[in-house]
Each structure stands twice: as structure tokens, then as C-alpha cells.
Amino acid sequence: MSRKVAHNALWNVGGQLVSLGVGLVALPILLHALGAARLGVFTLALGLIGFSGLFDLGLSRALTQTVSSSLGLGRSRAQVAALVWRVIGLLAGFGVFWLVALWWAAPFLVDRLFSLSGEMARETLFGLRALALSIPFALAATGAMGTLEGLQQFRLLSLWRMPMSLLQFGLPVLVALIRPDVGWVIAALAATRVVWMLLWLTQLHRLLPREPGVTASRADLHHALRFGGWLSVSNLIGPLMVYADRFYLASLFPPAMVAYYTVPFDTAFRATSLPQTAMNALFPALAETQSRPEASTRLLALAMRAVVVLVLPVVLVVAVFAHLLLALWLNASFAGPATPVLQLLLIGIFLNSAAHLPYALLQAHGRSDLTAKLHLLELPVFAVLLVVGVHWFGITGAALAWTLRVALDAALLYFTAWWLQRPLRLMLARGVGLLCLACGAFLLVVYALHGQLQLVLTGILVAASAFAALRMLRLTRLGTHTEITP
């Protein structure tokens, strides 16, 4: 099982690396073609796409959990297919509702929230309404992708995600070079959602066609809706806490200043979203093995160490060389205000990567209600941190608030998983200790050391992580994953 999950995770990571590479190439071109202000608006549109987890009311994730657990229990594929296609129909219907809502709210967002006027306001309004038209297609696509993940078709997903990533960024870049109008650039981004839907529904129909005469049971539909209902709370609050800071900043600062926050955030989030991508492979496996604690322990132990040895060296190197990398990638004037933002965000992104483990564990066991309640608890705390942080430290304060909120989220998730999963307590406690050591090393190297000593210790930590990663790969290939413990 661990070997299969590792292979699925590698396919996911490969697809994500292609997407990251395309984004790294596309953003400087968009900055040159559109300017900082319009690029800031484009990143806000990307933030709205990040709210797709809200729009689908948690049903795509519910499909992943339901499909994997049902097939693991030997349920009929015909019954599973009937449920899947019914839920995808519901998702398309929800998409029409959200289309109308965003179309109606777009003038308010442009005028009141973003405080735009003139040509910029016209372009942004056009782009937001184009984005609204794509929502039904996007939601149907997320349902199909969630089902394919439940079927553990990660190789198929990754192979198709690679060319689709080229289209997702390539089409907006092409439009920006021809016509530097951010409205049309966002419309190009929206058009790619239609292509995504056609692709994923075609693949799903090939693997899980609906059989005539077979209908979804009320019990299965009720379970999916209940799971998705609680998950929709997390999917509302989760993206809100990830992306609300940029909209709050947009209400206080001009778009060019917001870009100093959103560009490093989006880039760092994509660069370190590989663990989250890997967790997409872990989630259906945990749902399938929920009745076998020893198998879950092995999977989580492997995933815990993988997060530390793969993510820590990345965030550490980027933080140490943040100013140089931003200057080379964009320009020196942009690197100045963006560097402290990026460094603070990186430690938060590391903790967020580690928090996906208990999050996936709780949801694989059907406890989406607990993750939702934790997010409800965190939301007012984050709101206070954001307002106070921005008041005292400006854009850098937003990065500090986000990182502190992520640290709280990780602590609450690990404690909740430890409290509920008695057979996994020792493994979870060891994992938390490992995370504390990793965070201490990051803070020491980035903020306490300078010059040659900083570079030497960075090199030592990167080398140690590489050695540990190679050892993990060797053990996994040999099938001796039981030896891997945090």
C-alpha cells in the first residue's frame, strides 16, 4: 500500500512541478505586459478560483472519500457510478447559482472592495463576469477530478494536468501580449475551465460509465451531502483564511502594493504545494485503510518524514536567498518590499504542508465536522491578527498574521487527531517533535545567522534532508516501509 501511495504521490508531484514551472515563466511575462497594477488584479482573479472549494460545497472531496471507501468495502461499481454522476449533476446546478451570484456582485467588488475606477474598473468588471460564466463548468470538472482521485487514477490525472497547465497560463500570456487588457486576460483564464470540464468528464465516462436502470441510494447520497456539508464549512473558511488577506489589503492599498504580497505568496504557495499534492494520493488510501490502524500508521509515518525532508530544504533555501531570487526573477525594486513578506510566508507554508496530514486523516475517517469546527474557531483569531498586523506592519504584517494562524491550525489539527486516534498517538507525538525541530532550525538559520555561518548551516541541513530522502526512496522501493518512523 505504501509503495502504491508513493507512486501516486510522485505522479501528482510531477504534474505539480510542470504547473509550477509554467507559472514561474508566465508571471514575469504578465508583469511586463500588464504592469504591476493589472497583475495585482489578475492574482485576485486567481484567488477567486481558489474559492472553488467553497462553490462545490465540499462534494468533490466527498466523492473522493465515498468512492475510495465504497470500492474498498467491495461495493458495486454500478452503484458507485450512479452516485457519482448524480452528484456531478448537482454540482453543475450549484454552479449556475454561483454564476448568478458573482455576476450580480461583480460591480460591488470592483467599486467598493477594490476601489477601482476608470479603465481599470471596466476591465476588471469584464474579467470577473467572464470568470462567473465559467463556474458551472469548473464545478463539474472538480467533481470528475474528485472521483478520479477516489479511483486512485493519479497517473492519468497528472499526465493530463501537464498540458492543461500550459493552457491555463499560456492562453492568458498570449492574450496579454496581444491585448494588455486584464479583463480579456482573466476571460482567457476562464475559458480554460471549459476545456478542463470536457477533458475530465470524458475520462470519467470511460472509466466509470453510468449504467441504465441503476440509481443512487438515498443513504449514499445522504452520506455524501452530509460529509460535503461539513466540508463546505471548511471550504468556505479555509480559502477565506488563505485568500481573504489579499482582498483586505486590496481595500487599503493600491493594486501595485498588493502585488508585493500576492506574487510572493502565490509563487511560494505553488512551490511548496507539492506536499498537498502528495496528500491527495494519501487521502483515498487512508479512507480505504481506516479499519486497519497499522496500515494507516505506516502511511502517516512515511508521509510525515516526507514533508520534513522534502519541504524544509526548499523553504530554507528560498528564504535565505529570497532577495536575490526575487531580484533575478522580477526586478530589484520589487524584491525590496517583497523579501520580508516571502520569508515570513515560507515558515507558514511549511507548517501548512505538515498540517495536511492530520487534516487528511480526520476527513478520511469521515470527520469533516471536526475540521470545520476548528476552522470556525480559527476565523475570528485570524481576523484580529490580520487587522492588528496590517495596522502595525503594513503588508509584512499580513504575512505575519497568516503564518501565526497556520501555526495555530497545525497545532489544533494534530491535537485533535491525537485525541481521537488512540492507536496513532505515539506516531503523531513523534511527528510533532520532528516539526518543532524543523521550525527551530528554520528560524535560527533565517533570522539569527548571517554570512558564511548561515550558508554553511543551510548546506548541512539541505544535505541531511537529501540523504534522508534518498534513504526513504530506497526503503520504499525495497518494500521495507515498516522501518520508516518519524
Task: Name every feature range the model reports, one short phrase each.
Residues M1-G23, A78-G89, R122-T124, Q152, ...:
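N-terminal membrane topogenesis motif
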Residues M1-V5, V182-G183, W200-V242, A281, ...:
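Interhelical loop/hinge segments that connect adjacent transmembrane helices in multipass membrane
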Residues K4-S69, G95-W103, S134, F169, ...:
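Signature of the first transmembrane helix
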Residues L57-L73, E149-G150, L208-P209, P264, ...:
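Helix-loop junctions and terminal segments of transmembrane helices
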Residues A106-A130, A301, V318-F350:
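Interfacial segments at transmembrane-helix termini and the short loops linking adjacent helices
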Residues I135-R161, G183, L204, L346-L377, ...:
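Membrane-interface junctions at transmembrane-helix termini in multi-pass inner-membrane proteins
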